[in-house]
Amino acid sequence: KRSLGLTRGKNDELDAYKIAWFSYLFRDELSPSKMPTKTMFKLKSLMGERYRVVKAAATEKQVLKELFKQLDSKSIRRIKHRLKILTADIKAIEDEVKELVQSSPALKKNYELLISITGIGLVNATMMILCTNNFEGITNARAFACYCGVAPFEYSSGTSIRGKTRVSNLANKRMKTDLTNAARSAIVHDPEMRIYYKRKRAEGKEYGKVINAVKFKIITRAFAVIKRGTPFVKLRQAG
């Protein structure tokens, strides 16, 4: 609200002047951004559609679970019919996402590198590509961890305030949720991650902090395979 300082009145001309003035002051720190391609815009649209359909399916499943005994047979059949349609829609969208990714050599390469990591599937790989503009907009793991609310920050002031180190709420919440799902999957299917998780929990670390650490490990793996250009290889001695 007060980002322009103490100003009285507001109009487009004043706003344009302030933006131009600010840009001129920090011209040495500015770097040109690269617009996403048409393929990326289409990919974003498809993932948004998938998110909405998955949310609708989850609502129907919850209604069926909570009110199963109260609903009559006709209502149950209608809910199951809607779920069948929604499930088919999700598969159709995911198939279209795969086709779109395969149509672009650059997207295909990074996508296949990402899904070589245990815990990362279609959703996480595609969302990472979208959020980083195919790893051209965000190019390092720490910056991406900050973007999706995984990087911890210190909260302190002087000598009297010593708050806990915690993650920020200023984040891409959808990407953060997807990474949580990836972390849970990795703990189950990746021996190295499972050992790490159990060790940290045995040390008394909170569940949320350990899951967050696993998410960061997945992020670092993702950026490592993209940088190297080779698929992720599991450690044989783990497990």
Model-derived features: where do they sit?
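Long, charge-rich intrinsically disordered scaffolds of nucleic-acid metabolism proteins
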Residues: 1-113
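Short, solvent-exposed helix-loop connector elements
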Residues: 4, 31-45, 68, 163-169, ...
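Amphipathic alpha-helical interaction segments
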Residues: 18, 78-81, 85, 127, ...
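Short helix-capping/linker segments at secondary-structure and domain boundaries
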Residues: 26-31, 133-137, 185-192, 222-234
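Short alpha-helical scaffolding segments that buttress acidic/His motifs in well-ordered protein cores
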Residues: 43, 128, 178-183, 214, ...
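Phosphate-backbone recognition surface of nucleic-acid-processing proteins
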Residues: 116, 122, 126-207
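Low-complexity, acidic/Ser/Thr- and charged residue-rich accessory regions of DNA metabolism proteins
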Residues: 159-163, 197-239
